[in-house]
Amino acid sequence: MKGQTETIKLTLEVLTPLHVGSGEELRLNLDYIERGNIPLVVDRQRTLDALVSGDQALDEVLGGDWNLAELVKLAGQDFGYPLPMLSGRSETPATLREQIKDAEFRPYVPGSSLKGAIRTALLAEWLQCNPGYSFQALLPCPQRSRRDPSRTEPSKRAQFAAQDLLKDVFGANPNRDILRAMQVSDVRFQAADLRLADIRWLNIIHVKGQEKAAWRDMASRQNRDNWQDASGLYIETLAPDSAASFTLGWDRFLLSDLTKWGAPAHGAELLPADFSVLRKVLNNHARRIFENEVAFFDQYQATAPQKQLQKLLNRMQQDNESAYLRLAWGSGWRGMTGDWLDAPSLSTMRELYRLGRQNMPFPKTRRLAVQGTPCLPLGWVRLGPWREKVATVQRHPWVEQALTEIQQKNRCQADEALRGAQLADAWQVLRDPELKAAALADIQSRWREKGWWDQPPPGKSTKKALAIYRGDNA
């Protein structure tokens, strides 16, 4: 039995914009350029390799005050990836926060991030199901400051506030941690899954003795009534509906006898034995978050995000095979901690670590991605069974962006934009041969899925579009 790991293959589907940051900030004309009114994130190494391997003299390329756009032009090919806006607008900001990627510019969700979110949910649900477990004694308490004995300070720094509790629940050290028996792989996506998200801060303020929702301007730190008047920030995110596979494994040898490796005695009830049980635990935790967040937005008349969260809650309640989970940047204080503190303990921790303002709800801000209006909460994913898909052409970012712009400009449906001549006209003037070929492959795939390529729907615009794609008017 030693070394026996039971592994299942699952799908991680992104439900709302997901950002796992690299810690780096990308800058215009240093890391990306503007191409077709959207950012083109440049692979500088491949661009320089192309220049050096070509006819361009190395000293001419690297000497002086070089411009990234000029280097890309000299290379004769775009190395990197386009970054369409999630909201559909055409915009190239001065800076943006980078999504973590591998050496090939492919975004991924580290297994450690996914496992950390699972750990948080397991802790919260285990504490909910074991009200007799007294965790208060394991939390930090006030103590006299070493520097100033007249003042008090927490017995532990904020980043270690739950350390004793986590050791008591999961295990005294990494070798004895019950989650050592769970293995989670990285989840690897494609660059085409990335979108540029415009993030805004909804903030609760006091006005004439009453609480109300406003929008935090991140430049001036002032509050605005209209979100359009409040600046936010831009981040790379994995787009909703993007999906990739990963593996989840249970080490059956370790789980066969917890006492041999010093795991906690309650480990068997803490770590679900298979995905079907894990799914129920994660969904119980997700349901609490959904319900609390729906109530929060409803209280402050923030209808757009309230509807999005209610829609996700309804979807989860009708889904009998998947687990719903929130992770990574933007999940907020409650998402990071698991929101398991009772009211007295929360009040104590707020006072001890000076969390939030007195007489105000905590936390009082929410980060929302703009899609027409700030409405999308961040970080929600669905973990479900892996089903092999029939190979299809990858949806191309240029086609996605062009369709969105046509829909917004003409206020038309997606099918109308796809079959119309405006998309064909925009495609026809593309200068990059590789981009043009890839975009056409995507357009053809979409047309064939709807049966239009062989039996086009009636209309002059569709007839013209088909002629352009087939080269009949060349």
List the model feature ranges, each with a label:
Residues 1-56, 172-177, 181, 187-474:
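Basic polyanion-binding and macromolecular-assembly surfaces
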